[in-house]
Amino acid sequence: MKTEKKVLDELSLHASAKMGARDVESSMNADSTPVLASVAVSMELLPTASVLYSDVAGCFKYSAKHHC
């Protein structure tokens, strides 16, 4: 869980830089994992973020449309 939290925090920082902190907070209040995954893909963040996330989730396929 610590690794997943670390990745989510990293995605939040990237998303915050793109969207602004208020939008990220709104995303975190919802079901944060798929929301941030969608943000990571839709905002075209660094591919490494998706790779890191795949290691944690085990089912993330670089596209938020592929859910377990």
From Swiss-Prot:
The modification Pyruvic acid (Ser) is found at residue 32. The modification 2,3-didehydrobutyrine is found at residue 33. It is not established whether the 2,3-didehydrobutyrine is the E- or Z-isomer. Keywords: Antibiotic, Antimicrobial, Bacteriocin, D-amino acid, Lantibiotic, Plasmid, Pyruvate, Thioether bond. The modification D-alanine (Ser) is found at residues 38, 42, 50. GO terms for biological process: defense response to bacterium; killing of cells of another organism. The keyword Disulfide bond does not apply. The keyword Chloroplast does not apply. It comes from the Bacteria. Residues 1-31 form a propeptide. One of its GO terms (molecular function) is signaling receptor binding. There is a cross-link at residues 54-59, 63-68 (Lanthionine (Ser-Cys)). Inhibits the growth of selected species of the genera Lactobacillus, Pedicoccus, and Leuconostoc. This is Bacteriocin lactocin-S. It comes from Latilactobacillus sakei L45 (Lactobacillus sakei).
